[in-house]
Amino acid sequence: MVALKNIDFVGRWRVWFAVSGVFLLICVGAIALGGFNPGIDFTGGSAFTASEVQGSPSTAEVREALPGDLGDRSIVQSVGEDGYEVRTPVLSEEGYTDAEVRQALEEELGAEVSVTSISPTFGGQIRTQALQSVAAALAIIVLFISVRFEFSFAMAAMVALIHDIFITMGFYAIVGREVNLVTVVAVLTVLGYSLYDTIIIFDRIRENAPEAGYNRQRYEELANNSIRQVVMRSIYTSVCTLIPVVALLIFGESTLSDFAFALLVGIAAGTYSSIFIAAPVLCLYKAWRAGRVGSGRRRAAQSASS
């Protein structure tokens, strides 16, 4: 705690930005080179689910039960202690029907199999709506902070939130986890959590800021003091939140595990960005804007005197 109280959060912004830059470079590289592993929610396809399977066949045996070479292009996962989920591409494009694949799996697993199918067109619509929901959330956040505080705070918060999105999705690309609607819900949850942490710091900065005049050194000092006043609260809150998230990641089934993974990465990135990115960006932007205003006034004075 004493060590955190002595950190120059704003003055050492180059260090914090460099750390984020390394992670962002890795994450953006993973997204650009490896891409995501989209689920059938976005690409279309069929998901076959079976529970209470007898005999505990291996995933390889389940894959071999699929007709033709469909097993080579399908994803087979164990679900819980005695269940399986098989995700296939669009079966009509492969020359099969849901009924044929379902019958083959029921014969292999000896259990009733349920199926959910999504057409490629509908999957594309879901993907578009998911992107629109994230964009709308970011736009509403900018509007809210601009009204509640001022635009400089909104701009700094937006930088931190975009940082969190890229880090979260980058880790998804690195580990190859499936990106589906659960991922979108998790990203929106991360945005809300990260924004809450950032607002706490911004609100303290605004409370401590002088009413009149701007002085860069004084503003950076009060920003540092404001962060120090709430930094332990942010860390304690994050740690307490991550404990059940880790439990979900370890013990949860596939859907809960995917959700928990996004929360784990996103909350960690959000806590870091709220403390080490948002406030320094705010101070740098205010200094840049003050410099522009000062330069404009000097040019106006020189023009008036000449």
Roles of regions detected by a PLM:
Residues 1-306:
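A structural signal for conserved, well-ordered secondary-structure elements
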